[in-house]
């Protein structure tokens, strides 16, 4: 007689914990798999949330140049060392990363400088 999924689930409902552990072990050995994959997926999700709390590198993103495009271009030039044409193209293509991989304090400092000349900036 062939077993179907319902038969297996019914057996599992009535099985003792040790029987289920033995079944899992037998499945792991027979098929060369591990039940730890399901556990690590849940662990990775919780680790991901703590990683965002412990972020060490930040990107400064220019969201828009606001009303003072020329002043923002000048500030972007001084921050990045780009030429006039490159800085203008960068500012006009907002939202765009101005600097990446900065410490939190450096990113906040750049944000303040850009906001002081009228830009809308995010730190991510």
Swiss-Prot record:
Annotated Gene3D superfamilies: 3.30.1390.10, Single helix bin
This protein's record includes keyword Ribosomal protein: yes
SUPFAM superfamilies referenced in this protein's UniProt entry, alphabetically: ClpS-like, Ribosomal protein L7/12, oligomerisation (N-terminal) domain
Domain of life: Bacteria
UniProt GO BP: translation
Keyword Endoplasmic reticulum set for record: no
Stored Pfam families: Ribosomal_L12, Ribosomal_L12_N
Entry keywords, A to Z: Ribonucleoprotein, Ribosomal protein
InterPro entries: Ribosomal_bL12, Ribosomal_bL12_C, Ribosomal_bL12_C/ClpS-like, Ribosomal_bL12_oligo, Ribosomal_bL12_oligo_N_sf
CC annotations in GO: cytosolic large ribosomal subunit
GO MF entries: mRNA binding; structural constituent of ribosome
Subunit structure: Homodimer. Part of the ribosomal stalk of the 50S ribosomal subunit. Forms a multimeric L10(L12)X complex, where L10 forms an elongated spine to which 2 to 4 L12 dimers bind in a sequential fashion. Binds GTP-bound translation factors.
Function of the protein: Forms part of the ribosomal stalk which helps the ribosome interact with GTP-bound translation factors. Is thus essential for accurate translation.
Family from the record: Belongs to the bacterial ribosomal protein bL12 family.
Name this protein carries in UniProt: Large ribosomal subunit protein bL12
Organism for this UniProt entry: Borreliella afzelii (strain PKo) (Borrelia afzelii)
Lineage: Bacteria, Pseudomonadati, Spirochaetota, Spirochaetia, Spirochaetales
Designated gene of the protein: rplL
């Amino acid at each position: 007689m062939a077993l179907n999924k319902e038969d297996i689930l019914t057996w599992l409902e009535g099985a003792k914990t040790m029987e289920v552990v033995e079944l899992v072990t037998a499945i792991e050995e027979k098929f060369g798999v591990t039940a730890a994959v399901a556990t690590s997926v849940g662990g990775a999700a919780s680790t991901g949330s703590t990683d965002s709390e412990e972020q060490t590198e930040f990107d400064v993103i220019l969201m828009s140049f606001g009303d003072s495009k020329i002043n923002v271009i000048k500030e972007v030039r001084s921050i990045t060392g780009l030429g006039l044409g490159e800085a203008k193209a960068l500012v006009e293509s907002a939202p765009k990363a101005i600097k990446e991989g900065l410490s939190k304090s450096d990113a906040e400092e750049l944000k303040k400088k850009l906001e002081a000349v009228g830009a809308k900036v995010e730190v991510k």
